[in-house]
C-alpha cells in the first residue's frame, strides 16, 4: 500500500490530469484536496476528449472512489454539468463523493470576482473569473456556505442572509451592479443540493476508513507550486495551497499518512495570466511550443505563455513539496528543435543566484542563465520504453534529473494514455526511480 500526492511543479497546466489518470488505475481512492473550477484537466480516452474541472480523473475507473475534499471549493452548477457529461459518455459516477464541509461558490462570488478584476485595470492578477478567490475569502472570514448547508432550506436561508446583504452592498454601491435576490438563490441552490445529496459524505472519516483498510489513496492537487498562496509568485497566485502540504489540510489527514510525493513538470515551462516568468520566450520558438503543445487553458481557453524549462523553480518545487520523483510531460513537443535550453540559474542585479526569489519584484528582474543542449529532431511519440528514446532525448532527461536532484519515474510523450513510459509505478513500485 502507498498513499501518493500528485502536485504541479511549475505554474499549473503541467499535465497532472493524465498522470493522475494513469496512477488512478492502481488507486482505490482519489482525493481532490484544493482549488475549484479555476483548474482544469483534459483526459483522452479512446479518442474521446474529456475536460474536467472538479471531479478527479479517477472517476474513469469504476472500482475507484473519487472524493472532492474539504479544501476544495465547489461550484455545484458546474459540478452537475460534469456529472451529466460523464453519464452521457457512459461513465459510472456512483463512486463520486463530496465532502459535506467543502465550501460553495455562490453567484455573488463569480460576479464579484469579475468586477474586482476589471477594476484593477493594468494591475490585473489574471484570475479566471470563476469566483474562487471570493469563495476562499468568505471561508477565511467565516462567512461561507458549505455543501451541507444546501441540504436544508431553513439552514441555507439563515446562513446566506448576512453574506448576501454584504455582497449586495458591494455590488450595488461600489460596482453599480444590480443586487441579487435571496429567494432566487435559495431556490436554485436547494435544487443543486438535492441532486448532489447522495454523493455527500464526511471527508475525513471516509479517507481514514480507507486508510485503515489498507487502501491505496491518491491525493490530486490542482494548479501548481508557483501558484501557491503562501509559496508562489504572490500576488499572482491562486487562493489555496496546491503544494503537497495542502493535501493534509484539504483532505483532513496527518503528514504521516503520506508515503511519497510525485511532481509533474512539462519538459518546458508555461504560465497563464499575469506575473513574472524568467524563461519566457518570444517569437517563432514560443509559437512552435504553443502550437505543438496545444497551449490553451482548459478552463479559460487563454493562450499560455511558453518558455524554456526553468531548473531554478524546479529545485524550489522539489524543496517545498519534498518530491520523491518526477513525471516529465510533453517531451514530444520538443521533437523538432535542434537546440534546447534549460535555465540553471538567474542573474539578479549582476549576481548569479541559484535560488528562487519569492519576492515578485525581484523575480521580475531575474535574467535566466541557460545551459544549451542538443535536440533530437525526430519523433518520440511512439516510444514506449527508455531504450526507444533518441540518445539526445535521454541526455535531456538525465540533465533535468541531475539539475533538480530528483529521479524521473514517468515520461509522457503525448495526450493518449499509451503515450507514456512508466519507469516506476510510484504506488506499487519501490521507493526509487531508474532515471537519474
Swiss-Prot record:
Catalysed reaction equations from the record: IMP + L-aspartate + GTP = N(6)-(1,2-dicarboxyethyl)-AMP + GDP + phosphate + 2 H(+)
Annotated pathway: Purine metabolism; AMP biosynthesis via de novo pathway; AMP from IMP: step 1/2
GO biological process: 'de novo' AMP biosynthetic process; IMP metabolic process
The protein, known as: Adenylosuccinate synthetase
Binding site for Mg(2+): 13, 40
Residues given in the record as substrate binding sites: 298-304
EC number: 6.3.4.4
Cited PROSITE patterns: ADENYLOSUCCIN_SYN_1, ADENYLOSUCCIN_SYN_2
Enzyme superclass (EC): ligase
Name of the gene this protein is made from: purA
Amino acid at each position: 500500500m502507498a498513499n501518493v500526492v500528485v502536485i504541479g511543479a511549475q505554474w499549473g497546466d503541467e499535465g497532472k490530469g493524465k498522470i493522475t489518470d494513469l496512477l488512478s488505475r492502481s488507486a482505490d481512492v482519489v482525493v481532490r484536496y484544493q482549488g475549484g473550477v479555476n483548474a482544469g484537466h483534459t483526459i483522452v480516452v479512446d479518442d474521446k476528449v474529456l475536460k474536467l474541472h472538479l471531479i478527479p480523473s479517477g472517476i474513469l475507473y469504476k472500482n475507484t472512489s473519487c472524493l472532492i475534499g474539504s479544501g476544495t471549493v465547489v461550484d455545484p452548477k458546474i459540478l452537475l454539468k460534469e456529472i451529466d457529461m460523464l453519464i452521457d459518455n457512459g461513465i459510472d459516477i456512483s463512486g463520486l463523493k463530496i465532502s459535506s464541509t467543502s465550501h460553495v461558490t455562490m453567484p455573488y462570488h463569480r460576479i464579484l470576482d469579475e468586477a474586482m478584476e476589471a477594476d484593477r485595470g493594468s494591475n490585473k492578477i489574471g484570475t479566471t473569473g470563476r469566483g474562487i478567490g471570493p469563495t476562499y475569502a468568505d471561508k477565511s472570514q467565516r462567512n461561507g456556505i458549505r455543501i451541507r448547508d444546501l441540504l436544508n432550506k431553513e439552514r441555507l436561508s439563515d446562513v446566506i442572509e448576512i453574506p448576501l446583504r454584504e455582497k449586495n452592498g458591494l455590488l450595488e454601491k461600489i460596482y453599480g451592479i444590480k443586487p441579487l435576490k435571496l429567494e432566487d438563490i435559495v431556490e436554485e441552490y436547494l435544487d443543486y443540493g438535492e441532486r448532489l445529496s447522495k454523493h455527500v459524505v464526511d471527508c475525513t472519516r471516509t479517507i481514514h476508513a480507507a486508510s485503515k483498510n489498507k487502501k491505496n489513496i491518491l491525493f490530486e492537487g490542482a494548479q501548481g507550486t508557483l501558484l501557491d498562496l503562501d509559496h508562489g509568485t504572490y500576488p499572482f497566485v491562486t487562493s489555496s495551497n496546491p503544494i503537497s502540504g495542502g493535501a493534509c489540510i484539504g483532505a483532513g489527514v496527518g503528514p504521516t499518512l503520506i508515503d511519497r510525493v510525485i511532481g509533474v513538470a512539462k519538459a518546458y515551462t508555461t504560465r497563464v495570466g499575469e506575473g513574472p516568468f524568467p524563461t519566457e520566450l518570444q517569437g517563432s520558438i514560443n509559437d512552435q511550443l504553443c502550437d505543438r503543445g496545444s497551449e490553451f487553458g482548459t478552463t479559460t481557453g487563454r493562450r499560455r505563455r511558453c518558455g524554456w524549462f526553468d531548473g531554478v523553480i524546479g529545485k524550489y518545487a522539489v524543496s517545498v513539496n519534498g518530491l520523491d520523483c518526477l513525471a516529465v510531460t510533453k517531451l514530444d513537443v520538443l521533437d523538432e528543435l535542434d537546440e534546447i535550453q534549460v535555465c540553471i540559474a538567474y542573474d539578479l542585479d549582476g549576481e548569479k543566484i541559484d535560488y528562487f526569489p519569492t519576492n515578485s519584484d525581484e523575480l521580475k528582474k531575474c535574467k535566466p542563465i541557460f545551459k544549451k543542449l542538443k535536440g533530437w529532431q525526430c519523433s518520440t511519440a511512439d516510444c514506449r520504453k527508455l531504450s526507444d528514446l533518441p540518445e539526445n532525448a535521454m541526455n535531456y532527461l538525465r540533465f533535468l534529473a541531475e539539475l533538480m536532484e530528483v529521479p524521473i519515474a514517468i515520461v509522457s510523450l503525448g495526450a493518449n494514455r499509451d503515450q507514456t513510459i512508466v519507469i516506476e509505478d510510484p504506488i506499487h513500485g519501490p521507493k526509487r526511480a531508474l532515471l537519474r
